[in-house]
Amino acid sequence: MPDELKPHFANVQAHYDLSDDFFRLFLDPTQTYSCAYFERDDMTLQEAQIAKIDLALGKLGLQPGMTLLDVGCGWGATMMRAVEKYDVNVVGLTLSKNQANHVQQLVANSENLRSKRVLLAGWEQFDEPVDRIVSIGAFEHFGHERYDAFFSLAHRLLPADGVMLLHTITGLHPKEIHERGLPMSFTFARFLKFIVTEIFPGGRLPSIPMVQECASANGFTVTRVQSLQPHYAKTLDLWSAALQANKGQDIALQSEEVYERYMKYLTGCAEMFRIGYIDVNQFTCQK
């Protein structure tokens, strides 16, 4: 495999393999680490995370017996929901050892007879035909230079009627920031640098046109783009409140420095979503 297409194991593990117990202190019981969908204002975080998963899966046209590939499967909530609700076979890919081990336990404890696999591997290493693809909160880690390769692979793996649901945070081009009258400050620039160096090493956000153009260039039609921007601000508010409420345990598990870093990250990102510097979108890509 060429060096440029080796999965970014080190970058992903630097964040996601910090400690499962630490993440449990602020995530909901499904351990879903992406934007929730508050379909109703009175939803709990767990209900809203399941609603987000259902929103994504509902766009795929899943039928019993199909095989769903989950690229960046996290701690397995989307995979297991797909098996439970749609009676499909699932394959999950993750670069995180902790996540892979957790999903293996979920699979071992499941009584459902459908095939359920999790691979400690990147999409760059996967080459099996599947019926549908879902990817929630992983695209941000790929790097702009790999978008074409990812869409090309997805197109090749899917059947003629294949669909991929891509859920990713998106950023604005500086020109768009100016056109929308948003302030370009050193504070904003410093925060972005903090995120890509101390929280998500190697992370880069796509713009909406970038996703649409790469999808189209590789044979997909983007049939729908749905923004969940206000939902991510609320999700982050709930995460930071939970982290703060468990401060003593956070510090005991990690350190005060890690606690402060995560509070800065969660509260700062919530503000970025509220102001409009960043967005989160679900792209429905039809082959």
UniProtKB/Swiss-Prot annotation:
It catalyses: a 1-acyl-2-(9Z)-enoyl-sn-glycero-3-phospholipid + S-adenosyl-L-methionine = a 1-acyl-2-(9-cyclopronane)-acyl-sn-glycero-3-phospholipid + S-adenosyl-L-homocysteine + H(+). SUPFAM superfamilies: S-adenosyl-L-methionine-dependent methyltransferases. It is found in: Cytoplasm. S-adenosyl-L-methionine binds at residues 33-34, 68-76, 94-99, 123-124. It comes from the Bacteria. Keywords: Cytoplasm, Lipid biosynthesis, Lipid metabolism, Methyltransferase, S-adenosyl-L-methionine, Transferase. One of its GO terms (biological process) is lipid biosynthetic process. Pathway: Lipid metabolism; mycolic acid biosynthesis. Catalyzes the conversion of a double bond to a cyclopropane ring at the distal position of an alpha mycolic acid via the transfer of a methylene group from S-adenosyl-L-methionine. Cyclopropanated mycolic acids are key factors participating in cell envelope permeability, host immunomodulation and persistence. This is Cyclopropane mycolic acid synthase 1.
